[in-house]
Structures are given as C-alpha cells and as structure tokens.
Amino acid sequence: MVAIRVIRDAGADTQVPLPSYETTGAAGADIRANLPDRGSLTLAPGGRALIPTGLRVEIPAGYEIQIRPRSGLALKHGITLPNTPGTIDSDYRGPLGVILLNAGAEPFEVVHGERIAQLVVAPVVQARFELTEALGETERGAGGFGSTGRG
C-alpha cells in the first residue's frame, strides 16, 4: 500500500472526512467538496465549476493521482469531469480542486461534504521520446477513430 501524505488548507472544514475507500475492493477513494461557506453551489445545465476539497497531498515519486467521476453522479445527474482523468503529479503541492461539469438537463446542487469524485493512485512510467526516420509497419497502420469497427 502506498502512503499519501495529506494536509488541510487553512480554513478548510476539519469535519469533512479525508478521501476514503467505501468498499474493500474499491479502486478509487471518494473525495468530498469542502466549500468555504460550508453551504452549497448550484451548477446550471452545461455549467462547470472548480470545487475545492480543502486538501493538499504529497504523492511519492513514481506515482500520480487520477481524479475520476463518480458513476452514480454521472448516471443519475449528468455530473462528470471534463478533463477525465485529471492528473495530480507527484511534485504538485497546491490545493486540490475538482472541475465538475453538469451535462444533465437539470440544475445540480453541490453540497458541502458531499462525495464529488474518486481518486485513483497509479504508478507512472516516464518515456524517452526519440525522433526517427520511419515507424514500424503494423496490420492496422494509420487507421484510427473507428477504423477497427463501429465506434
């Protein structure tokens, strides 16, 4: 298990739980809204907002945290993340915010303390990019965007 060090932002509500896994087999830890006024924020249909979590993290070198939508919010309310997955790099120490997008037809109220997204800790492999004269041939070739079948 990888340890992620966490601190709270100044003024954050200390009663809002830290990210947590809701089941023993969960890949993602739920993260919650930590709104400055302890109230709520309404996202109009098509609207988006940066929702504060009140947290900062220290991720070990060789890892990242991916921020992903919660499937229930997406299915029931159309709430998603426009930059899915969002990436938190191991050298970032700033406040964690989650960009929520209301792709639904109705306004959605983000409530203080509510679970708004999932954090997935993942290993990182950095590559070396080498300029070359040609690429190796494959059966697929340059076919993309549905070239191997419908969608």
UniProtKB/Swiss-Prot annotation:
Residues that, per the record, bind substrate: 70-72, 83, 87-89
Enzyme class, UniProt record, top EC level: hydrolase
KW Magnesium (keyword) present: yes
One of the record's GO molecular function terms: magnesium ion binding
Keywords, ordered alphabetically: Hydrolase, Magnesium, Metal-binding, Nucleotide metabolism
Gene Ontology process terms (BP): dUMP biosynthetic process; dUTP catabolic process
Pathway participation: Pyrimidine metabolism; dUMP biosynthesis; dUMP from dCTP (dUTP route): step 2/2
EC number(s) recorded for this UniProt protein: 3.6.1.23
Chemical reaction(s) catalysed: dUTP + H2O = dUMP + diphosphate + H(+)
Gene3D superfamilies documented for this protein: 2.70.40.10
Recorded family membership: Belongs to the dUTPase family.
Function: This enzyme is involved in nucleotide metabolism: it produces dUMP, the immediate precursor of thymidine nucleotides and it decreases the intracellular concentration of dUTP so that uracil cannot be incorporated into DNA.
Protein name, as recorded: Deoxyuridine 5'-triphosphate nucleotidohydrolase
Gene source species: Ruegeria pomeroyi (strain ATCC 700808 / DSM 15171 / DSS-3) (Silicibacter pomeroyi)
Lineage: Bacteria, Pseudomonadati, Pseudomonadota, Alphaproteobacteria, Rhodobacterales
